[in-house]
Amino acid sequence: DEILPQLEGSVDVLAGNSSGGIAAFYSNTNVLKIKVKLSFKFHMGHMPYTGQAGFDLYIGNTYHDMKFYRTSNFDFNKTEYEFTYFNHANMNEENKLFVLNFPLYATVEEVLIGINPNSDISPCLDLFKNEDKIVFYGTSITQGGCASRPGMSYTQILSRMLGIECLNYGFSG
């Protein structure tokens, strides 16, 4: 907070964007929902709303073998939304790894994850193969500019391919 007043106005705002953020957990749920609160609405005409303020979901057994499942859809005129990724009564209830990629251009104030109340959930503490990290610093392309959804920014693609945490310090403009 001490440094923010010294930054140019746009960097101050962009520093709150959640590009590169993830929530990773194991669960045997057959229901997955999110409830999201964003700081403000987004209307960037050159980029899909799903990339700007959507969350996308990957499911698998390990981070390296994850498959894209779905991206949240929402009313882009609102700062709060709820989205159900799935609600399958007959879904195989074995433990799976779930990774939610956070929006590329939104400042997320709150995200709540809802699962079946009879299901187990635990944080994924072993997501990456090693403790090393790759730090990316750059402009809008690094932040994820114009990607159709959060998991398609190049830093997230590399993170999945290499199994390593990528820290995204991309700032548009």
Predicted regions: what they are:
Residues 92-96, 103-112, 127-173:
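Conserved SGNH/GDSL esterase-like catalytic core that processes O-acyl groups on lipids
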